[in-house]
Amino acid sequence: MNKDLTVGKPSQVLWQFCLPMFGSIIFQQLYNIADSLVAGKFIGENALAAVGNSYEITLIFIAFAFGCNIGCSVIVSRYFGAKEYREMKTSVYTSLIGSAVLCVVLMGIGLLGCDALLELINTPEEILADSALYLDIYVLGLPFMFFYNIATGIFSALGDSKTPFYFLAVSSLSNIGVDILFVAGFKMGIAGVAWATFLCQGVSCVLAMVVVFRRIRAFHTEGHVQLFSWNMLGKVAVVAVPSILQQSFVSVGNIILQSIINTFGASVIAGYSAAVKLNNMVITSFTTLGNGISNYTSQNMGAGKMDRVKEGFGAGRNLVWLLCVPLVVLYFFFGRFLLLLFMNDPQGPAIDTGMLFLRILSPFYFVVSVKLVADGILRGCGLMVRFMIATFTDLILRVGIAAVLSATALGSTGIWMAWPVGWCIGTALSMVFYVTAIRKALAEPLAVAEAEGQAAEVRAEAEFAADAEMETL
């Protein structure tokens, strides 16, 4: 079902649109959490550390898939909001072809270079072989991840957040069962964990793509629809490339952090691996709402309803704060019970490390959630430079502070303390950019977009605004 995000009360529209997206991202996170949970419970602490260590490298591939998702989603959303269905179809087909080429290149790089990267980040010898095996199988499944992300981006652009939720719910729950079957039943070890994810993501991807093509063909268009357009690829790339660079930069920063953490041994790696999975569920949920706001913003820009963009920020902020309250209480006071899902020793150094991580970070969810809402609007408006500056500043500070403090008497605790500092400064920057840029965008959308180098999209935005003004007159 397609949904028009340009009408209705913003808070209600965002809630109805984003609620299934929250469910989808929770099930998406269950893929990696299930891998860690089964590895830790049925194989051992070293297996948990191996999956967690590999996860930071997989984030590089996820960054490219996520960037393709955002680029496709924003452009498709804009044409859908403007009712220009022929261009919308061309943007869909172009995004799929471009993503396929990128995926093939990344598979080659991954299969040839992951082993060297594992050694570069100080992976302990006792988990090196398992980490390499997990990554090799993961890379083989990249096409499934890429095309599924493109599919979800298209669904979101059309205002449909329920369809991907249904696919992921079934696939993620199946993944848990297949994980246990392969590891506990067939005794496949770490390979069983990876192959289970490969299989279930493949099923989810195929189903999603079938529905996407049916949905797109249902739109009536006149004239020839191009299957590929270099001009359209350029428009998608204007949004996708900054997102890919931003996410890749974040991934590289996380890999540097992982290399610092690896110097403290397998127990600290295991504790961090479990805790960061819980943390990522929260951050990814906030990011998902930000993505929803990006689609909301883009559709309303396409329809020339810039006043609704500003209203979307307040509605989004209130939604994430409602989520923060129970999550902070749960992680701060009851995090140990959640960590025990991943490990068997309730008193060991691994669980103590994870609990300290959660207690340091969780109170600052109220801060970083605001940043991610503001970032969503900046992306939806095409103000990618501002978005990237705020994100890069956060990460650079986090890595730098972690490197310095970890070398002091604080040890690994100093690494965890770096997160809140980076979040606070990054949020301040995002808010400054949001307040200044969105005011200019409301008054002079053409000038702001040109200042950001979005020349191709500026003309379309100007036409949308002109049409809206004529309707008002």
Place the predicted regions along the sequence by residue:
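Interfacial/gating helices of multi-pass transporter permease domains
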Residues: 39-59, 125-130, 190-191, 232-239, ...
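Hydrophobic transmembrane alpha-helices of multi-pass small-molecule transporters
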Residues: 60-63, 175-180, 204-209, 281-284, ...
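Short runs within selected transmembrane alpha-helices of multi-pass transporters and secretion channels
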Residues: 69, 138-156, 164-175, 193-206, ...
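Residue-level signal for short hydrophobic patches within transmembrane helices
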Residues: 11-30, 34, 57-64, 140, ...
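Helix-terminus/linker motif at the lipid-water interface of multi-pass membrane proteins
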Residues: 30-49, 118-125, 181-188, 248-277, ...
